[in-house]
Amino acid sequence: MKHALLIPPVGPFSDPHALVEVATAAENAGWDGVFVWDHVLRAKSPVEVADPWIALAAIAIATHRVRIGPAVTPLTRRRPIKLARETVSLDHLSDGRLTLGLGLGVDSSRELSGFGEVVDPRTRGERLDEGAELLCAMWSGETIDYRGQHFVADKVTVLPRPVQQPRIPLWFAARGQARKPVRRAASYDGIIPIEVDTRQLADMLEIVENERGSLDGFDIAVRPTGGRQYRAFSDLGATWTFVEPAAGDPDLLQVAATDPPTLF
């Protein structure tokens, strides 16, 4: 498996300079990826939160090898054209190292309801499906005429295209027993299972394999809770491991400077 550091850009790590320091330490230590949360609020009490796209741009400039990206961006609260522009620019800035993690988002910190965003899960799912489809169409560089229930692109051409072709890799979050998010992920390039045990991951991957015919070329980015689960997930075919320190962890830089397999 490849190993990625998943950084909560909050508290002391809401400073992009601190995030760059962590990312460069991780690259030097042999990590394969550096990803960041995409939240606008976090926790019930006020806390500093960095913008993920500004942070990722800084990380892209400071690093040369690691894959980078958000894990995950709630597409339901973003305009697809704005996200298309941001992702293509970041893909060029990083020389084709961007992976885009997408999901429904959560409202536990009122980062949806607090700003009048859509909260209804069904509607968020519809917006996620439409938004992902529209993103891929805009990345194509072709003139598109898209009319969905939630988004419209009226005979427009969006350039430049991403460095990566046929598209920037799309990984989708999926939680627990929900089957629709797994099938959604199977239509794209990867899955980020959230809070799953070994049996649940096996069930998810069975769905993916049934949908795709094979797991070949499909990324599975897991967050194991320890060495035993790490090995079990690897046996099931996981391709990436996320190591996610606690938000504001003062030892984050030390973790980043550690050879990742030794953490398990």
Where are these regions (language model features)?
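Active-site-adjacent structural elements that line small-molecule/cofactor binding pockets in enzymes
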Residues: 1-264
